[in-house]
Amino acid sequence: MAMFDDIRASLAPPHPAGRPFIMGGLIAALLGVAIGHWLIWLGLMFTLFCLYFFRDPERVPPARPGAIVAPADGRIVSMGLSAPPPELGLGAEPRWRVSIFLSVLNVHVNRMPLDGVVTRIAYRHGAFVSASLDKASTSNERNALAIRVASGQEIAVVQIAGLIARRILCGVREGDPVRTGERFGIIRFGSRTDLYLPDGLRPLVAEGQTMIGGETVIAEMLP
């Protein structure tokens, strides 16, 4: 079943952010056809890579009230207590942070972890070290979002650029209501996504575990 899920995901339509790259590859391939040049193969390979990289499969969030889901596909590379990004104004009290590394083979669409309202979005320029390193959370270019949930608590999701990824896209604004599993952005070509849980919550996952964005439950809100 997992194999068929992977095949179905790889055939998913591309995210709109990938269209310029896909069109560029197709134009290069057509130009290669016109001039009888090896450019056709380069264009086709680039197009196929972009179709795979920007794939955007549908996801079904769990029907469990209070379930906090993974904001991205990938592998958990770090877990621990850490203060959320200061630009969000959530205080300096450490809370559980779950860091997910997205390789170039993972789906790169970011999804909302829980129902709520976006209260703050803050972009910070920075470095571009490998997103698999722990220092990427504090050193790299990032886009941080604070989301207030029904209980009044706030969680944070941080889109982090990587060594190759140099473009972070976010499709929501401050004040927008959001739903669990809803698409809200994408990071191009390898990246990291951090999730800061509300105060007092502990993750239900483990370091090294593979996440499915919008579906894997990372934690549950207290009743």
Regions found by a protein language model. Give the residues of each.
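Contiguous, well-folded functional domains in the mature portion of proteins
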Residues: 1-223
